[in-house]
């Protein structure tokens, strides 16, 4: 601002506005000197601060350390002040009975030159000596409030988020689909989708058409994912529940236990198969011998033949035996005063040698081929293994596991059926056990 040293000087108080280090605008009443200067051929009143320099902000007057003040023009005898936009700016009281005022924004003219018009009427001004520490904390609070109000206003302008619709993500619907399919066991896509649509529409009522399409699409995607990880299976339109994958340790223990159980069952079935093959071979050997004897004209007497099946009781000659029979002859009760042995017909046939050494693993190659002709073709390898004594686990291994397993079942069923068939017909007397007198004496005392 241009000013001259000449002119009238008058000491008075004037309103000073300054901007602090935080960018806030404040005003205060300060002793000043008024000088009349000539500018553009017209007298202009120029105000200068007393006790502080108008050109620096680091004075010791207590104002410079808060903000920078400057020289401002006065037009007439009335005190003028700067009008700036700073709503809600206030200055605290410093003396008893003093007041403060709020400065509102007004349009000014000549802001670049420092000349201001339109005096503000009816305002009361504060006369105080500012405390730098209190002023700094107060200005910090004002700035914080200003920033908070700015952020609040900006957030209010932002677009409001709509609440979550029923169309949620794939993870959500995968869980829902899992629960539905597990609950039903067997279901279809339409049934699962209809149930989920009704549930979601009941909880969330928005755009029904849009949400239904979204839910059905999510259900379709979830079913494909679950089918890919083998949780469910799909056969045409029918969806079946398989189950969620379990923990690897639990799965390993369960498989290990199942493996042991199956191996034990296989072992038992192998023993059953071996016993059935032995019975089959013994019966075939008996039939062949009877045919050979009949062809030679040897016909046993009724006392020398025993009908199958039978049980032989073996004990000492001095043993006292008490035998009682029920009226329907379905039960026989024996009482012995000494030890005794009981043998069924199969055991007797084994002792008579009709197995040709097959049970002991001492069968000759000729007898092995002979026995193979008595059994079904799929059991021939078992006969060879029993005859040679090679009855390890390797005999049950095969390149074609499915065919081997099926052959195993068929052989077991055929052998069991043959045993039942033989037992049924031997009761009618079709098969006869012919024993020599020497053999009877050896087995029955």
Curated annotation (Swiss-Prot):
Record's compositionally biased regions (Acidic residues): 435-445
One GO cellular component term: nucleus
SUPFAM superfamilies, A to Z: E2F-DP heterodimerization region (SSF144074), Winged helix' DNA-binding domain (SSF46785)
Biological-process GO terms, alphabetical: dorsal/ventral axis specification, ovarian follicular epithelium; eggshell chorion gene amplification; endomitotic cell cycle; intrinsic apoptotic signaling pathway in response to DNA damage; nurse cell apoptotic process; oogenesis; positive regulation of gene expression; positive regulation of nurse cell apoptotic process
Gene Ontology molecular function terms on file: DNA binding; DNA-binding transcription factor binding
Positions of the UniProt region annotated as Disordered: 145-168, 392-445
UniProt subcellular location: Nucleus
Keyword field contains Transferase: no
Biased composition (Low complexity): 145-156
Keywords from the named record: Activator, DNA-binding, Nucleus, Phosphoprotein, Repressor, Transcription, Transcription regulation
In-chain residues carrying the UniProt-annotated modification Phosphoserine: 398
Residue spans of biased composition, Basic residues class: 158-168
Composition bias type Polar residues, residue spans: 412-426
Keyword Transcription regulation: yes
Record's function text: Component of the DREAM complex, a multiprotein complex that can both act as a transcription activator or repressor depending on the context. In follicle cells, the complex plays a central role in the site-specific DNA replication at the chorion loci. During development, the complex represses transcription of developmentally controlled E2F target genes. Can stimulate E2F-dependent transcription.
Family, per entry: Belongs to the E2F/DP family.
Subunit comment: Heterodimer of E2f and Dp. Cooperate to give sequence-specific DNA binding and optimal trans-activation. Component of the DREAM complex at least composed of Myb, Caf1-55, mip40, mip120, mip130, E2f2, Dp, Rbf, Rbf2, lin-52, HDAC1/Rpd3 and l(3)mbt.
Official protein name in the record: Transcription factor Dp
Natural source organism: Drosophila melanogaster (Fruit fly)
Underlying gene: Dp
